[in-house]
């Protein structure tokens, strides 16, 4: 999450999502998150991981992401390098809390650490601000797989709210 550390980031433009990009966005997400899930799985109790991902993390992510792309396309933006999608984001608005949320942020592996996530977040901040919200939230995991995401959000000025989740098998 480094601002413009690579000349490629200067050639990135943000554009609205449209359905013809669906498969490319889904493929990018799986490539971006494969190493995250590989590091996350051993850090999560096995019964929790199995319940969340009974058919594998890829199937769950594809289903969840497809629902966002189909149901909230007006809140999805792409970072494009020419005709190639370098990353994407989706936001949600929570007017009851005067808060926007960066619900999804994914960068293609070949564009990571080149400022793409920063550009997407800045665009999301502007969309959320324009909607009249006073703050923005992002959630991520506390496991080793999400370490880079935590660094990215902290470097963008996000402050953590300590939360604990506990699980018990029945």
What do these predicted ranges mean?
Residues 4-6:
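Intrinsic-disorder-associated, low-complexity terminal segments enriched in Asp/Asn/His/Tyr and depleted
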Residues 11-13:
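Extreme N-terminal starter segment of soluble prokaryotic enzymes
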Residues 16-103, 108, 121-122, 127, ...:
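Acetyl-CoA-dependent GNAT
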Residues 93, 108-114, 145:
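Active-site acidic-Proline motif in GNAT/NAT acetyltransferases
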Residues 112, 137-149, 167-170:
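Conserved beta-strand-loop-alpha-helix junction that forms the acyl-donor binding cleft
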Residues 134, 159:
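Short acidic/polar active-site loop segments enriched in Thr and Asp
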Residues 153, 158:
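Conserved active-site tyrosine of GNAT-family acetyltransferases
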């Amino acid at each position: 999450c480094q601002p413009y550390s690579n000349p490629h980031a200067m050639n990135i433009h943000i554009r609205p999502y449209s359905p013809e990009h669906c498969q490319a966005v889904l493929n990018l997400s799986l490539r971006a998150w494969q190493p995250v899930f590989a590091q996350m799985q051993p850090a999560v109790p096995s019964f929790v991981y199995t319940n969340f991902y009974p058919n594998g993390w890829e199937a769950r992510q594809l289903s969840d992401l497809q629902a966002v792309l189909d149901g909230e396309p007006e809140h999805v933006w792409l970072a494009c390098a020419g005709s190639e999608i370098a990353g994407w984001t989706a936001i949600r608005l929570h007017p009851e809390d005067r808060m926007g949320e960066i619900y999804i942020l994914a960068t293609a592996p070949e564009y990571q650490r080149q400022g793409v996530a920063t550009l997407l977040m800045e665009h999301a901040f502007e969309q959320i601000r324009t909607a009249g919200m006073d703050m923005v939230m992002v959630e991520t995991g506390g496991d080793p797989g999400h370490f880079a995401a935590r660094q990215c959000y902290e470097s963008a000025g996000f402050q953590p709210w300590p939360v604990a989740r506990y699980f018990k098998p029945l």
